[in-house]
């Protein structure tokens, strides 16, 4: 609605996990470095955690664009499965043609595939997002898959991505064998206050239709400060506020987004949140 008014080719503050908008904050870059290290060194199991809206899925999608050509991946987004369904999803996402419908048969087909890919010099990575939703039995299944190996290397690298509750799940006594196999961990924190203005301007720059024209959208310093306080540095909340602010600016026919506009947008978001929870 407001894109043409502001000279934008797309909405800069969508809450979807678009890697084109990846912002290299200190913590996000550290997260990418941990993932690249864990995969390249074939560490086996890697755990990436962060609160809701901190950019975990965006980091994973950006990571997929950074890995070398010999890295092949399967990306499971919502693992609310049974053990059989999880295996079916992994086999399907790796592009494996399997006529087996039993758990043992699919593991056999997966192992054969991993061995062939290893001989070809490829590194296979399984990413499971929202892994805090995995029941203990499924996490044990993941551990067993991570056991697939040659004399020298792990055949499958596993990245578990989830909210902090994932750590609580992994600390269960029955999952102690899995916990001992986690070789790389990283927790994504919020953006620093000084990064928030850079983050906003970065997304506006990516979305700008004419790169040779100066960005005509201006958030005042007071507006940025209020966004920082309300969002506590959480990218998703920053996006929600800024998207509403651009709409409010469009309705008011202004490119200058000040404290008053941001205050109204935050009040609307708070009101909506209260209504949702009523």
Description of each model-found segment:
Residues 62-66, 166-181, 190:
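Short regulatory helix/loop adjacent to the ATP-binding pocket of P-loop NTPases
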Residues 76-80, 169-170, 183-196:
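Conserved AAA+ ATPase "SRH/arginine-finger" region at the nucleotide-binding site
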